């Protein structure tokens, strides 16, 4: 994995191989960042955030078959609230994800998102 300058990673965080975390980002405790995740600069990942790369596309776990995994890309200046779940998506720059949200689709416009599934609440 690659972790940029001036980052903070809290206790009990699992960061799997191949993950990229940009400079000045913070990852709070008990978060899980699986393979194929890239996080931009100046991001905040709250406590207990889970990133998922296996969508169980054929009704069962990929069982290590990486061809079934999908990537997640988080832009710059993104804040993700505690206990959010991020499926394989692209999140643009300047986004806030509320605590407990489940992000199931790409986020292409800056703003505040929350809920299950996450939806846009407002612009900045």
Model feature map: region roles:
Residues 108-109, 124:
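Conserved beta-to-alpha transition
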Residues 109, 114-117:
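Acidic, glycine-centered active-site loop in nucleotide-sugar glycosyltransferases
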Residues 94-103, 112:
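C-terminal/domain-terminus segments
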Residues 1-91, 117, 124:
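Flexible, glycine/small-residue-enriched loop-and-beta-strand segment within the central core
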């Amino acid at each position: 994995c690659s972790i940029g300058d001036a980052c903070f990673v809290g206790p009990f965080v699992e960061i799997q191989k191949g993950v990229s975390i940009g400079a000045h980002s913070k990852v709070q405790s008990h978060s899980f960042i699986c393979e194929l995740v890239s996080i931009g600069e100046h991001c905040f990942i709250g406590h207990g955030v889970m990133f998922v790369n296996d969508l169980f596309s054929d009704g069962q776990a990929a069982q290590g078959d990486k061809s079934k995994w999908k990537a997640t890309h988080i832009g710059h200046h993104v804040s993700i609230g505690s206990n959010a779940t991020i499926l394989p998506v692209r999140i643009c720059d300047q986004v806030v994800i509320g605590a407990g949200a489940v992000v199931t689709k790409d986020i292409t416009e800056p703003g505040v998102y929350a809920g299950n599934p996450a939806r846009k609440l407002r612009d900045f």
